[in-house]
Amino acid sequence: MLIFEHSRKNRRNYSQAPATRPAKNNIPDHLKRKSTPLLPEVSEMDTVRHYTRLSQKNFSIDTEFYPLGSCTMKYNPRACNSLAMLPQFLSRHPLAPEDTGQGFLACMYELQEILKDITGMAAVSLTSMAGAQGELIGITMIRAYHEAHGDTGRTEIIIPDAAHGTNPATAVMCGYKVIEIPTNRDGDVDMDALKAAVGPKTAGLMLTNPSTLGVFEKKVAEMSRIVHAAGGLLYYDGANLNAVLGKVKPGDMGFDVIHMNLHKTFSTPHGGGGPGAAPVGVAERLLPYLPVPIVAHEQGVYRWLTEEDRPQTIGRLSAHMGNAGVLLRAYIYVRLLGAEGMHRISEYATLNANYLMAELRKLGFEIAYPNRRASHEFIVTMKEIKDRTGVTAMNLAKRLLDKGFHAPTTYFPLLVPECLLIEPAETESKETLDRFVAAMKEILDEIATQPDMVKAAPHDMPLRKIDDVKAARELDLVWDPAG
């Protein structure tokens, strides 16, 4: 039921604006709307009940463990939200003169510098508003680099078969042909295939490290040498940066460009369709092409660098400089944790993943890459269980909902049949992981004794069986008062 369906004519609710200061309305009369906005007329009690019921129908990191692989569903500290919503930040207009926003510009400059240090890059731009847009920026800069050097014959981007789907989509959007290379049985990129794929047409290699298989590419330095020797550049998909914070820098691995998902590694809110942010870092060779604006600090004053300062820039990717509120939350997060805290993130994320992997292995679950240490996530394959009982990975995932846990990522990466990609972020306690293990044991016992019951799951959700295809293909997000 939508909030609009609770609406009744002339039903009222009190405005709950802050009472600490008088309300200001500086909107000129000629810009004020003349008609009444189409808003629901609902009492305070009905409003509270409506949104409380909705929250009870959804899983969230605020209520339970959320081991969604390759998504890093860590807790978002409330302090980050509170500080980012200070009136001084919220009332700042992006077109205000630079001298009136020195505090905000200082925060953005420091965030750029912190991300440079974390990644080992020469410079960072904060303008990108999503991970996929960060990829687009990175590959566009690689293209600009080759074109600036007259190397227009480079028409191919090499991508491992374990990559996120956005990688090949980005390469195609930038006009490149995708060359897919296989993964070997240990989970690493097949080096012979890489050597065979590189050549005068190679524009670059897109790589996630650790990969979506949950393992660190052991020969990443050699891969860098091979691609660079062929004249190509290396793109780092920062989806799994959480696993290596403070331990190794993408710049030290030889990468030329990186995007960082702030909603993963730097604890900004997930979901809801945004707002998002994915800062992009570059090595020296790509520095001229960074998108603008970028914050500079010169003679004690912060200012925007624009196209006039960076004539070779690929341009602007957002109306101003990205999603300011999200960037502020990330800045506050890294300042709260400090350097030591950033080191501990990767340590605890890796510890949690390996502990959970070991406990599930003891129960009899098959680990996809049993000879490798989990970097921050790992894969359980249920192929043998499905062949023996007919119970699929999706069945188990839906049964986990009945146990009070969000399901892991299912059927990704595509290389592993009947897979569950499980990522316990660093913020989860051992007690939480043990409860999850106990739930997995219960389901394993149910598969042995009541497989049909598991196949029919979930049983206790407000909505049980959803048409996944229709939900994805036929979105209906606009309320129509006429029905």
UniProtKB/Swiss-Prot annotation:
Q: How does it assemble?
A: The glycine cleavage system is composed of four proteins: P, T, L and H. In this organism, the P 'protein' is a heterodimer of two subunits.
Give the function comment from the record.
Answer: The glycine cleavage system catalyzes the degradation of glycine. The P protein binds the alpha-amino group of glycine through its pyridoxal phosphate cofactor; CO(2) is released and the remaining methylamine moiety is then transferred to the lipoamide cofactor of the H protein.
One GO term describing the cellular component: cytosol
User: Coding gene?
Assistant: gcvPB
What InterPro entries does this protein's entry cite?
A: Aminotrans_V_dom, GcvPB, GDC-P_C, GDC_P, PyrdxlP-dep_Trfase, PyrdxlP-dep_Trfase_major, PyrdxlP-dep_Trfase_small
Pfam families in the record, alphabetically? Answer: Aminotran_5, GcvP2_C
> Among its keywords, does the record have Ion transport?
no
Q: Which family does it belong to?
A: Belongs to the GcvP family. C-terminal subunit subfamily.
Organism this protein belongs to? Nitrosomonas europaea (strain ATCC 19718 / CIP 103999 / KCTC 2705 / NBRC 14298)
Supply the name of the protein. Probable glycine dehydrogenase (decarboxylating) subunit 2
